[in-house]
Amino acid sequence: MINDIKKDAQERMTKSLEALGRNLAAIRTGRAHPSILDTVKVTAWGSEMPLNQVAAITVEDARTLKIVAHDKNLSAAIEKAILTSDLGLNPSSAGTTIRVPMPALTEETRKGYTKQASGVAEDAKVAVRNVRRDALADLKKLTKDKEISEDEERRAADEIQKLTDKFVAEVDAAFKAKEKDLMAV
């Protein structure tokens, strides 16, 4: 029972950390990276589709993404989707190939993105702490139902706290790495 609670808590905390990684990857740095366009949806064949399903996205150089549409008729729709996204990117089209240069980040935008990354990291910490709260509540219920002793509850609670501390430290490390990446000129 206790092991199930700890295992569930660890799995949920791991999922929170993975979500943090995806969310931080979506925050633009000065470098070109295909994950920047993960949020872009293209109207294709009568429905909204993620850009990576209708085109191949590659890194051409440090500051340019190259997009090749699977269907040449979608080039205009892809270009429009990138322009209308709130990423501040300005694609240029040449036949079926679309190039997306990454504009250099100003100090102000760097600080804004750092603040956004900080918020994402804080949300991840809250998620990890909510998992801890749920696990501790489950332990209390087991103690109340006399399925485990108070000593076992305390030991398990300490282990869950250590797990929480470990994941919060990983969240902090991920944020610090992203902050360093954002502030590098």
UniProtKB/Swiss-Prot annotation:
Gene3D superfamilies: 3.30.1360.40, Ribosome-recycling factor. GO terms for cellular component: cytosol. Keywords: Cytoplasm, Protein biosynthesis. InterPro entries: Ribosome_recyc_fac, Ribosome_recyc_fac_dom, RRF_sf. It is found in: Cytoplasm. One of its GO terms (molecular function) is ribosomal large subunit binding. GO terms for biological process: cytoplasmic translational termination. Its main location: cytoplasm. Belongs to the RRF family. Responsible for the release of ribosomes from messenger RNA at the termination of protein biosynthesis. May increase the efficiency of translation by recycling ribosomes from one round of translation to another. This is Ribosome-recycling factor. It comes from Pseudomonas putida (strain GB-1).
